[in-house]
């Protein structure tokens, strides 16, 4: 459940601190309440995440639009991290066993992957890439996970694995 509903809740919470939500204070007033240093760090990291998504081809000659999907990509990653931390905190001191050959951490990430699974036609991929502020389901899963160290540890991801992303290329906004 943490990998599914926990991620959705964390996603919505993170919108308060994404590229749009960060411009509003606790009362909903549009105001710059961040320090210049914090804003600069955020913008630099957010730009790296947008660029990372924009490098991905979703079809022949067509790339994802990391600028258009930035807020949702930040929220997806933030929701994933918030939920994972809550999951690990709830499990402290408990013996959690493998089920069907999967560790608790692996099941968390599998739950996350199932949340955004899609089976869509190529024409829909193109349409969504042009109009949707959400990344395609495959990117919401794979690209978010490729940036999260706990995913590498859970599945023992190695440099030769398809999901591997070099540590210096990984981007974590929050």
Walk through the language-model features, giving the residues of each.
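Zinc-dependent metallohydrolase catalytic domains
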Residues: 1-6, 16-174
């Amino acid at each position: 459940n943490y990998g599914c509903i926990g991620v959705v809740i964390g996603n919505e919470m993170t919108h308060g601190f994404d590229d749009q939500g960060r411009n509003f204070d606790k009362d909903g007033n549009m105001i710059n309440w961040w320090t210049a240093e914090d804003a600069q760090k955020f913008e630099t990291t957010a730009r790296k995440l947008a660029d990372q998504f924009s490098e991905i081809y979703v079809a022949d000659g067509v790339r994802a639009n990391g600028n258009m999907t930035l807020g949702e990509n930040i929220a997806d990653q933030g929701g994933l991290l918030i939920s994972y931390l809550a999951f690990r905190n709830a499990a402290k001191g408990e013996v959690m066993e493998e089920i069907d050959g999967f560790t608790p951490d692996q099941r968390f990430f599998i739950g996350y992957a199932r949340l955004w699974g899609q089976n869509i036609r190529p024409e829909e991929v193109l349409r969504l890439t042009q109009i949707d502020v959400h990344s395609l389901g495959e990117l919401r899963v794979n690209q978010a996970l490729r940036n999260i160290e706990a995913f590498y540890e859970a599945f023992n991801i190695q440099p030769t694995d398809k999901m591997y992303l070099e540590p210096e290329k990984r981007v974590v906004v929050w």
